[in-house]
């Protein structure tokens, strides 16, 4: 019975920590760049694009395909940074909890 109470207490603590992390993540920003900084995209912690910067040299019709590729690459880089930050925060939050391998938070 004590073990169950201890697990319930840890679950409540984890829930409170997760809420705090989610609030912190909402304020996080990451910028991804591509093409030697010709394109940059900034995301917030909810993976919403907050800024896109495109070098004027890419704004030519014949450069459209290159620009599309660079935008995707910059977005993917920024998204990876956000994902890594979330993973690090989650690791620190769940330290010491007996979670199965590959278990991801938030649910």
UniProtKB/Swiss-Prot annotation:
Identify the keywords attached in UniProt to this record, alphabetized. Answer: Cytoplasm, DNA-binding
Q: Which domain of life is it from?
A: Bacteria
Q: Which GO terms describe its cellular component?
A: bacterial nucleoid; cytosol
| Pfam families noted in UniProt | YbaB_DNA_bd
Q: Where in the cell is it found?
A: Cytoplasm, Nucleoid
Family annotation (Gene3D superfamilies): Nucleoid-associated protein YbaB-like domain (3.30.1310.10)
A GO term, aspect molecular function: DNA binding
- For the keyword Cytoplasm, the answer is yes
Q: Family assignment?
A: Belongs to the YbaB/EbfC family.
Quaternary structure, per UniProt, is: Homodimer.
Give the function comment from the record: Binds to DNA and alters its conformation. May be involved in regulation of gene expression, nucleoid organization and DNA protection.
* Stated name of the protein: Nucleoid-associated protein BT_0257
Q: Which organism is it from?
A: Bartonella tribocorum (strain CIP 105476 / IBS 506)
């Amino acid at each position: 019975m004590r073990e169950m109470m201890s697990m319930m207490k840890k679950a409540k603590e984890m829930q409170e920590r997760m809420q705090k992390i989610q609030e912190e993540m909402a304020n996080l920003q990451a910028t991804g760049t591509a093409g030697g900084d010709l394109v940059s995209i900034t995301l917030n912690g909810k993976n919403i694009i907050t800024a896109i910067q495109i070098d004027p040299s890419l704004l030519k019709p014949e450069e459209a395909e290159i620009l599309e590729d660079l935008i995707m690459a910059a977005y993917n880089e920024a998204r990876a940074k956000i994902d890594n930050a979330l993973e690090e925060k989650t690791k620190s939050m769940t330290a010491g909890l007996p979670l199965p391998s590959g278990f991801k938070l938030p649910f």
